[in-house]
């Protein structure tokens, strides 16, 4: 089962409106951010968990500003709530792992993406994602 299939399954298992909006990802849907984070030395103890939580946060970003991969809804309010829920899901799982460095790095990504959207600078959001994923993975030269 792919990381995005696992994320969709978790949303369905929670029940409620998000479960109803959860869909299987398209074949070949990109989960590269989670895969990159999971492949780094900082995620070595729990790579599958890191892949899932990074992709949960990425899905939250896409629910807010783009095209989500495992959610389908025409209700903009539900999409925003889903995005917030997915941000919280990923950050909560990181906190449970005790990885405060990664919590900070991905919280910074969320803030930078909100700023980039407000300023209509999508390239800044993608740059923030690249920096954040490298930081979570431990491949960025930053201290942990």
Regions found by a protein language model. Name each.
Residues 3-144:
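Mg2+-dependent prenyl diphosphate-binding active-site environment of isoprenoid biosynthetic enzymes
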């Amino acid at each position: 089962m792919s990381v995005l299939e696992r994320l969709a399954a978790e949303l369905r298992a929670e029940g409620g409106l998000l479960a109803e909006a959860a869909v299987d990802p398209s074949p070949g849907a990109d989960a590269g951010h989670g895969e990159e984070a999971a492949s780094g030395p900082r995620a070595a103890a729990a790579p599958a968990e890191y892949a899932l939580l990074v992709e949960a946060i990425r899905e939250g970003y896409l629910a807010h500003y783009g095209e989500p991969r495992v959610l389908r809804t025409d209700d903009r309010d539900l999409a925003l709530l889903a995005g917030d829920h997915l941000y919280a899901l990923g950050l909560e799982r990181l906190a449970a792992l005790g990885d405060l460095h990664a919590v900070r790095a991905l919280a910074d990504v969320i803030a930078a993406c909100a700023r980039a959207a407000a300023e209509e600078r999508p390239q800044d959001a993608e740059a923030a994602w690249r920096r954040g994923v490298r930081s979570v993975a431990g491949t960025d030269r930053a201290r942990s």
